[in-house]
Every structure is written in C-alpha cells, then in structure tokens.
C-alpha cells in the first residue's frame, strides 16, 4: 500500500500527509522553501522536483524508508468540515480551474443533468442560487461516499479521517496535527520541531490559494447553506471528522475547534 498522498522535503526534515482543501498549497510551498530558500515557481501541486511526492515513482522508496524509520517531523492539517465542503463546492464545482476548464471535464454538466445543479458562468458573473445548488451538490457528494455512484468519492470532499487513516494503517505515525483555522501557530510549531536547512517564519509567508479568483464568492454565511436535511447528511458523511478533530457540529458558523486533538485517540481509532 505504501503512503499515498504524502509529500516530503528532500532533506527528510518534514513529512506531510496531504488533506485536500486544508491549506495544502501553502504547506507545500513552505516545505519547498524550507529546503531551498525560495518558493516553487507555480502551483506546488505541479512540481516534479525539489519535493518528494508519493505520486513520483523515484520518491516512493525514499518516503517509505523515512516514514518507517521515523525520520523528520510527520504532520497533517485539518479544517472545519462545513467550511471545507463549501470550499470544495465553490472551487471544484462552481469555479473554473487554472487551465480554463471545468473540473474533471464533464462532471459539472453531468451534475446539472442528474442533480439539477446550477453554477453560472464567468459571462453572467456566476449568477445562480448558491444555497439550492450547494444542497444538491451535497446529495451528490453523499451518493459518491455512501454508494460510490455515480462515481467514486473525490479526494476534495471525502472525509479527512479517511485521508489521514491511510498513513496510520500503513505504518506511519503523526507527530503533530494542527488546524487550518489557527494555521500560523500550528505550522510554526511543526517547523520549530524540525531541523530544516532554511528557517521559515510562517508569519512572513504569502498564502498560496490556487483556487482564489477563479469562481464565485460565497454570498451567505455558512449556516444558511445547511438546513436540517443538509446537516443530517453532513453528520452521516463527516461524523468522525467532527468528533476526532473537535469541530462544532451544532453551530455551522463556529469555524473554530472546540478543543485540542488527542493524537493517541486519532491513532487508535484510525489505525484499526
């Protein structure tokens, strides 16, 4: 099985299990900078050198050895499930991707046909009923996760606990898991614990939000997108995420965690 979704610095000082829609672009750029003293020119997801990635064949043995030998600081980052799913919708479904196309080719037309989702377009300034379309997208996301139809779950809206668990079940252990909502503090603690070739001041790092500006802005507060049925579906899909990572299910507008993550509990419950 190995360690899919893992990025590692060439110095082996930092090992990161990527969780999509949880600041992964910024984290990847910080890792790159911590080795090279400069940021990658472009989207870090497109890099093929300067940063080990499990998806690169020549990186797999290096990553596996470092993880199993417990070299470097191993970490990941999580985000409020309500906010993460909304971000996935506005970026991947309603937005235009960096290449000027819709995400996954015919996915959006398929959702328009089968689920009645509307997303607008740049020509009409993305004018559509955001709440109605998001709730229909949520039904689609639930169908992919529960029944794997009309397609397998996408990494951008499948549960964080699922991403994080593969690393544990295949023999890895996390040193730190921090919150997107307190990103600077959490990322700095990771860097302070690591021996990186280049020191990084997280407060001075620009934010590398690769999806910014390519789609509509969220027009309503978070809670307005989630009626009783929507919240029932969210609990069905993300129950473990709320519980393990201490997010407030009862108040969608409270994006902040309600407590600290218990790493021992995470390893015990996700390592089964």
Predicted features along the sequence, with ranges:
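Membrane-interface amphipathic segments in extracytoplasmic regions
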Residues: 1-272
């Amino acid at each position: 099985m190995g360690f899919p979704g893992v990025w590692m610095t060439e110095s082996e000082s930092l090992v990161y299990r990527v969780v999509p829609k949880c600041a992964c672009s910024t984290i990847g750029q910080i890792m790159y900078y911590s080795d090279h003293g400069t940021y990658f020119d472009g989207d870090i997801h497109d890099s093929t050198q300067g940063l080990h990635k499990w998806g690169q064949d020549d990186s797999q043995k290096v990553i596996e050895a470092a993880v199993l030998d417990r070299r470097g600081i191993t970490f990941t980052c999580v985000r409020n499930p309500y906010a993460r799913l909304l971000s996935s919708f506005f970026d991947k479904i309603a937005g235009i991707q960096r290449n000027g196309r819709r995400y996954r080719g015919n996915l959006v037309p398929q959702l328009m046909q089968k689920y009645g989702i509307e997303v607008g377009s740049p020509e009409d300034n993305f004018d559509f009923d955001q709440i109605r379309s998001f709730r229909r997208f949520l039904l689609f996301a639930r169908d992919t996760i529960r029944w794997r139809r009309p397609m397998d779950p996408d990494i951008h809206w499948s549960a964080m606990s699922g991403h994080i668990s593969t690393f544990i079940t295949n023999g890895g252990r996390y040193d730190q898991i921090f919150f997107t909502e307190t990103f600077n503090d959490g990322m700095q603690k990771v860097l302070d614990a690591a021996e990186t070739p280049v020191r990084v001041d997280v407060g001075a790092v620009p934010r590398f939000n690769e999806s910014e500006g390519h789609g509509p802005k969220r027009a309503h507060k978070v809670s307005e997108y989630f009626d009783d049925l929507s919240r029932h579906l969210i609990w069905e899909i993300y129950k473990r995420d709320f519980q393990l990572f201490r997010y407030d299910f009862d108040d969608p507008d409270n994006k902040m965690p309600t407590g600290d993550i218990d790493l021992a509990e995470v390893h015990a419950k996700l390592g089964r």
